[in-house]
């Protein structure tokens, strides 16, 4: 088994946990996930991470509030029988359901599909908050969100950076350190001279 199983999907990528085995590595990275996506989207995401990282590195203890560091390209070989379990259902948001395992692997071999390794930050708040949520975890999540807003979001907003897609699915809770971290900067934007473009005025301006 080269990696993990598909666990979630967004519009542009499908998440595998544990991480897939990247070319040149003898073992998969521990405490990482692999976001599998089309090559062009991976290029764009890495470029965005570089831009965002340059801003967020100036924020004290930024690693407590964001997942933008230690993100690397992961070129992997064909998915095997274990890797592909649940791929069609879990990855339907990023890849067409009609794409067979053979066609999927063919796109990998052609370099059309690649991956990005990202540190595992926990489950998103949509999956975390439910009927089995304990009062202790609820309190920890609330504290984590308050710290994220006060020490993270407010500070990068002051640096004229807007995330524009802050919601429960883009916030991860890690029970180990009790932090809530913001992810998915795909539609973020920087602005100048206190002017926000018309295209983003209908979004959450944070």
Model-found features: residue ranges?
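Conserved structural core of kinase catalytic domains
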Residues: 62-141
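C-lobe/activation-segment region of protein kinase-like
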Residues: 179-206
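Conserved hydrophobic alpha-helix
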Residues: 152-156
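ATP-binding glycine-rich loop module of kinase domains
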Residues: 11-94
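Catalytic-loop of the protein kinase fold
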Residues: 157-174
């Amino acid at each position: 088994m080269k990696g993990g199983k598909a666990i979630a999907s967004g519009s542009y990528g499908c998440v595998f946990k544990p991480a897939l085995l990247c070319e040149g590595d003898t073992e998969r990275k521990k405490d990482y996930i692999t976001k599998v996506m089309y090559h062009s989207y991976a290029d764009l995401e890495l470029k965005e991470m570089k831009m965002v990282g340059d801003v967020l590195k100036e924020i004290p203890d930024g690693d407590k509030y964001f997942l933008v560091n230690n993100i690397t390209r992961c070129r992997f070989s064909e998915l095997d029988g274990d890797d592909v379990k649940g791929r069609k259902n879990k990855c339907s948001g990023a890849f067409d359901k009609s794409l067979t395992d053979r066609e999927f692997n063919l796109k990998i071999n052609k370099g059309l599909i690649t991956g990005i390794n990202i540190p595992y930050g926990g489950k998103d708040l949509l999956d975390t908050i439910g009927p089995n949520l304990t009062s202790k975890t609820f309190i920890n999540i609330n504290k984590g969100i308050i710290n994220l807003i006060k020490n993270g979001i407010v500070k990068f907003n002051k640096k004229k950076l807007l995330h524009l897609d802050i919601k429960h699915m883009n916030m991860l809770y890690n029970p180990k350190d009790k932090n809530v971290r913001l992810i998915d900067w795909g539609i973020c934007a920087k602005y100048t001279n206190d002017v926000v473009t018309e295209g983003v005025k209908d979004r959450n301006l944070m």
